[in-house]
Amino acid sequence: MPEESAYLDSVALNLHGFYTGLERLFELIVRRVDGALPDGETWHRDLLQRMTQDIVEIRPAVLSQDTALALDEFRRFRHLVRNVYSLSLVPERIAGLMSILPQLWFTLRAELLAFSDFLEALAQVTQEGNGLSDES
């Protein structure tokens, strides 16, 4: 059915965009905080895994292992959409991703906000260390 195909394509592209947006955020964190992006054929997977790691004296983990594991399903699906696209879109797989998305988003949002709080505290300490304050 053309309507079902168009719907699946639309949902697939939205799931693709969801993960791509997160990956851009992870890239920004790694570039600005960690210092260097992973490279090689597995860099997308390595980047996601790096988000689960505490980097001593630099930053806490951005994501829990459980969140990263769930996001890895979206990463793998994004790869499928990019490289095989509609030839292999399985409605059940899309439905599975859609069913976990609300709870994943709730958890992911909390973890990202916690990391944002860390960055804000770090910025405050850095400003104070440089003799800057909100009143300067």
Could you tell me what each predicted segment is?
Residues M1-S136:
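Solvent-exposed interaction patches of small proteins and small membrane subunits
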